[in-house]
UniProtKB/Swiss-Prot annotation:
GO terms under cellular component: cytoplasm
Name of the featured protein: Elongation factor P
Main location: cytoplasm
Gene3D superfamilies: 2.30.30.30, Nucleic acid-binding proteins
Top-level taxonomy: Bacteria, Pseudomonadati, Pseudomonadota, Alphaproteobacteria, Hyphomicrobiales
Cell compartment(s), UniProt: Cytoplasm
Keyword presence, RNA-binding: no
InterPro entries: Elong-fact-P_C (IPR015365), NA-bd_OB-fold (IPR012340), Rib_uL2_dom2 (IPR014722), Transl_elong_fac_P/YeiP (IPR020599), Transl_elong_KOW-like (IPR013185), Transl_elong_P/YeiP_cen (IPR001059), Transl_elong_P/YeiP_CS (IPR013852), Transl_elongation_fac_P (IPR011768)
Family: Belongs to the elongation factor P family.
Organism of origin: Rhizobium etli (strain CIAT 652)
């Protein structure tokens, strides 16, 4: 176990709190004008999936569990869960629906992801920062809108809604940020 300050905790980290392992779902640092800065952390207990919210002063020490981050390639999904393969030794790992969470919408066959593994158990998944998806449907452009400040809603091929610039039409492939579902650019392929 490694002690780190609370302000350095990030999404996907695995913490040891009171002898139990937790995966960090969100971590935010708050710096009020008056008072002590704090870090608000939402976590999921690995053993039973219970969600917990903790608040620490940013300078407090928290224990980070030793987790091995390994590149895995996504293969397929079935009733057991999501199957990944380690390209270095061809070992296969099954990741549960609970561990995957809402990130499953971005998984594409053959995609390389980083799995955080603790004692042989996959705890968290880190997707690539950007994925390329196709726009399935989008609303027509309203005449008179300027291109600089307006975005229009669009549906991606994975079922997620996002906002895109007015010049993007259905059938266009775009690059999307997996962290916040935001449009990055038109795909260059």
């Amino acid at each position: 176990m490694v002690k780190v300050i609370a302000s350095s905790v990030r999404k996907g980290n695995v913490l040891d709190v009171d002898g139990k392992l937790y995966v960090v779902l969100t971590a935010q640092n708050f710096h009020p004008g008056k008072g002590t800065p704090v870090t608000q952390v939402d976590m999921r207990r690995i053993v039973d999936g219970v969600k917990v919210s903790e608040r620490w002063r940013t300078t407090e020490q928290v224990e980070r569990a030793f987790v091995e981050d390994v590149n895995f390639q996504y293969l397929y999904e079935d009733g057991e869960g999501f199957h990944f393969m380690n390209p270095a030794n061809y070992d296969q790992v099954v990741v549960s629906q609970e561990t995957m969470g809402d990130q499953k919408a971005y998984l594409q066959e053959g995609m390389t992801c980083i799995l955080s593994i603790h004692e042989g158990i996959p705890l968290a998944l880190e997707l690539p920062r950007h994925v390329t998806l196709e726009i399935v449907e989008t609303e027509p452009v309203v005449k008179g809108q300027t291109a600089s400040s307006s975005y229009k809603p669009a549906m991606l091929s994975n079922g997620i809604r996002t906002s895109v610039p007015p010049h993007i039409d259905a059938g266009t492939r775009v690059v999307i940020a997996t962290e916040d579902n935001s449009y990055v650019e038109r795909a260059k392929d």
